[in-house]
């Protein structure tokens, strides 16, 4: 499978951008991490006057066969029910997107029950959910490739419409199990560091989840390469996000990274092209146990720590105002020379 080439950021611009930030009418470093964020935006866009256009969140929804193994506190039909809630405008991501003027797109990547056509729903179905990876690979290599291609296509469509800042959310019962297996196999960390309670498993449910995932990892010990791991354990929504990350970076878009599931999809993308990380803004550290360890793999410093464990792209929407503020101060704050303000004494 061919992936778009991701250009590395131009480090020669770093001192130029840092000088522009330091010349603003404030003590050096006084805006803290907002300054690092502004620097990253400038590097991605190659300018000291970055402009963020048409912020968008794409929510990919799909079902997982491993849900049949009892690894989630909720039944699989909740995936389709939540998609209907998204379309009705009643979910958290709908509320936060409306609040902040973020465009929202809902993609059926492979919900178990086919959904009727509806305004706002994009049909990219690969199949009626994945197979149960406790027994067999979740998808074929061809299905994984088709899902990644579909994710790339959605991003390119938005890029062509002028969007240059994008985030990805997901909905899929049992997708924390898929993410945990992806994380364990691609990082080599102990399964215990990758697994959490998901949507609220009790102790018995967590023990069941641990047993199922350990068995699946042992059964599929031969799956080692990133695309093989994705096809074996992933979900259609995760594969679409992995492709979407690659396409967004290749299009030099600012990428908002949500929670555990999205970061697991990014892990696949990063194993395929490490340059993807340069375009990523990590929006938050979630309550899901594996997320903190996965962020550490990327040496990432997330913007928010709100104990979120919802997914949907909610972290992207909540962090968006910080990006807007970073771009605004870089564009609009006066400089010491322009405002006639004295700099600090040597």
From Swiss-Prot:
Pathway: Nucleoside biosynthesis; alpha-ribazole biosynthesis; alpha-ribazole from 5,6-dimethylbenzimidazole: step 1/2
MF term (GO), any: nicotinate-nucleotide-dimethylbenzimidazole phosphoribosyltransferase activity
Keywords, alphabetical: Cobalamin biosynthesis, Glycosyltransferase, Transferase
Domain of life: Bacteria
Catalytic activity: 5,6-dimethylbenzimidazole + nicotinate beta-D-ribonucleotide = alpha-ribazole 5'-phosphate + nicotinate + H(+)
InterPro entries: Nict_dMeBzImd_PRibTrfase, Nict_dMeBzImd_PRibTrfase_bact, Nict_dMeBzImd_PRibTrfase_N, Nict_dMeBzImd_PRibTrfase_sf
Catalytic residue positions: 312 (proton acceptor)
Keyword Amino-acid biosynthesis: no
Enzyme Commission number, as recorded: 2.4.2.21
One GO-annotated biological process of the protein: cobalamin biosynthetic process
TM stretches of this protein: none
Pfam families linked to this entry: DBI_PRT (PF02277)
NCBIfam families: cobT_DBIPRT (TIGR03160), PRK00105.1 (NF000996)
UniProt record similarity statement: Belongs to the CobT family.
Protein name from the UniProt record: Nicotinate-nucleotide--dimethylbenzimidazole phosphoribosyltransferase
Gene, per the UniProt record: cobT
């Amino acid at each position: 499978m061919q992936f778009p080439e991701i250009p590395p950021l131009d480090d020669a611009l770093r001192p130029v951008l840092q000088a522009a930030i330091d010349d603003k009418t404030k003590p050096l470093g006084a805006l803290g991490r907002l300054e690092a964020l502004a620097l990253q935006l400038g590097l991605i866009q190659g300018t000291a006057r970055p402009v963020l256009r048409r912020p968008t969140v794409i929510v990919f929804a799909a079902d997982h066969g491993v849900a049949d193994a009892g690894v989630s506190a909720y039944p699989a039909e909740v995936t389709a029910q939540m998609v209907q809630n998204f379309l009705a405008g009643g979910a958290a991501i709908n509320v936060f997107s409306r609040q902040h003027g973020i465009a929202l797109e809902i993609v059926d990547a492979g919900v178990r029950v086919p959904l009727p056509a509806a305004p706002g729903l994009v049909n990219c179905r690969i199949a009626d959910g994945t197979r149960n990876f406790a027994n067999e690979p979740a998808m074929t290599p061809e299905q994984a490739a088709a899902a990644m291609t579909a994710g790339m296509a959605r991003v390119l469509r938005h890029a062509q419409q002028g969007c240059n800042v994008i985030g990805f959310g997901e909905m899929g019962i049992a997708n924390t199990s898929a993410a945990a297996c992806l994380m364990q196999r691609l990082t080599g960390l102990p399964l215990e560091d990758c697994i959490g309670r998901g949507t609220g498993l009790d102790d018995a449910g967590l023990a069941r989840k641990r047993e199922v995932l350990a068995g699946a990892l042992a059964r599929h010990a031969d799956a080692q390469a990133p695309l093989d791991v994705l096809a074996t354990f992933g979900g259609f929504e995760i594969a679409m996000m992995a492709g979407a990350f690659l396409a967004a970076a290749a299009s030099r878009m600012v990428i908002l990274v949500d929670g555990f599931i999205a970061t697991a999809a990014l892990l696949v993308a990063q194993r395929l092209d490490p340059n993807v990380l340069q375009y990523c803004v990590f929006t938050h550290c979630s309550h899901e146990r594996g997320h903190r360890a996965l962020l550490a793999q990327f040496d990432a410093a997330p913007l928010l720590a709100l104990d979120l464990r919802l997914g949907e792209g909610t972290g992207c929407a909540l962090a968006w105002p910080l990006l807007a503020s970073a771009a605004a101060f870089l564009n609009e704050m006066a400089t010491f020379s322009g405002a006639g303000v004295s700099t600090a004494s040597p």
